[in-house]
Curated annotation (Swiss-Prot):
It comes from Blochmanniella pennsylvanica (strain BPEN). The lineage of its organism: Bacteria, Pseudomonadati, Pseudomonadota, Gammaproteobacteria, Enterobacterales. One of its GO terms (molecular function) is nucleic acid binding. This is Ribonuclease H. GO terms for cellular component: cytoplasm. Monomer. HAMAP family: RNase_H.
Length: 151
């Protein structure tokens, strides 16, 4: 039987590009774990992707996951576009490499071990406690970036 994990993610960027942060909250029964990390120069979309990546990579065993995000970019990318990109060797319809290909490929690997992942969109800033907490953690991480990134 797989553990049922609920994940909340968010990314933040102070300027776009600029310093950024990402955060994730993982819930399993009564347990809760928070992650956040800041980058010196990045974009909002890269931070949304990194939030999901750090959450999924923290899980060492296959799980059933509900991943909540307020990012349409992440949601549409992982549920619709990624299949097309992979089929076309990570190129867009204009024959250009997919933006943030490094993170999309990393996310693609991270989702492979899990039995079920349900991707759920949450409207941001509507008062959901875990979504609001992720937003707060991501903004704090963006204010104190410790890692290099590139966009």
């Amino acid at each position: 039987m797989y553990k049922k994990i609920e994940i909340f993610t968010d990314g933040s960027c102070l300027g776009n590009p600029g310093p950024g942060g990402c955060a994730a909250i993982l819930r399993y029964k009564q347990h809760k774990k928070e992650f956040s990390i800041g980058y010196r120069l990045t974009t909002n979309n890269r931070m949304e992707l990194m939030a999901a990546i750090i959450a999924l990579e923290s899980l060492k065993n296959p799980c059933q996951i509900i991943l909540n995000t307020d990012s349409q970019y992440l949601l549409h990318g992982i549920t619709q576009w990624i299949h097309i990109w992979k089929k076309h060797h990570w190129k867009t319809s204009e024959e250009k490499l997919v933006k943030n290909i490094d993170l999309w490929q990393r996310l693609d690997v991270a989702i492979q071990i899990h039995s079920i992942i349900h991707w759920n969109w949450l409207k941001s800033h509507t008062g959901h406690p875990d979504n609001e907490r992720c937003d707060q953690l991501a903004r704090l991480a963006a204010k104190c970036p410790i890692n290099e990134d590139f966009y």
